[in-house]
């Protein structure tokens, strides 16, 4: 079973994340940030990665530490579940529409973290959620998951739709990348022999 759990405790947050790569997209996410929970649910459902997040953060300050630290812990959990990455497809991409929004994601589970972010949100908030935190989450996820991650907004006028299409696009790309390659199930997907 390709699964992993992470517990991360700082002066700002206490976070527990569990992932099961060969799941069905089950989720149980409780961060105290409603919109963010909704996005994490989308990430699980569309990647088919079972995901459980328990986060307690300094929400009296703002949502930033909770969202960013969840990204850190989730990245670490994904990296742990992937292990040496033997047999995975490694790459994934998705062009995902949601009403007015069209988001493209391409990723490589390369152990070389990098984020290219071409997403402009038209509003500063979605309800009470700061839209700039979407980028903070994916920066943390890519950095601590060892993911080369390109996300581009091609069209969009509604911030909620843009954010949701972004999470769903990344989820669908992850779904492809973490799959076991039936033709190379015993091989590291690199000519270097390691990732």
From Swiss-Prot:
Q: Where in the cell is it found?
A: Cytoplasm
A GO cellular component annotated for this chain's UniProt record is:
cytoplasm
Keyword Amino-acid biosynthesis in the entry? The reply is yes
What Pfam families does the entry give? IGPD
Question: Keyword Heme: yes or no?
Answer: no
A GO MF label: imidazoleglycerol-phosphate dehydratase activity
Q: In which pathway does it act?
A: Amino-acid biosynthesis; L-histidine biosynthesis; L-histidine from 5-phospho-alpha-D-ribose 1-diphosphate: step 6/9
- State any GO BP term from the record: L-histidine biosynthetic process
Q: What is its main location?
A: cytoplasm
Q: What is its EC number?
A: 4.2.1.19
Q: Sorted alphabetically, which HAMAP family does this protein's record hold? A: HisB
User: Which family does the record claim for this protein?
Assistant: Belongs to the imidazoleglycerol-phosphate dehydratase family.
* PANTHER family named in the record: IMIDAZOLEGLYCEROL-PHOSPHATE DEHYDRATASE, IMIDAZOLEGLYCEROL-PHOSPHATE DEHYDRATASE HIS7
Q: What is this protein called?
A: Imidazoleglycerol-phosphate dehydratase
User: What is the originating organism of this protein?
Assistant: Roseobacter denitrificans (strain ATCC 33942 / OCh 114)
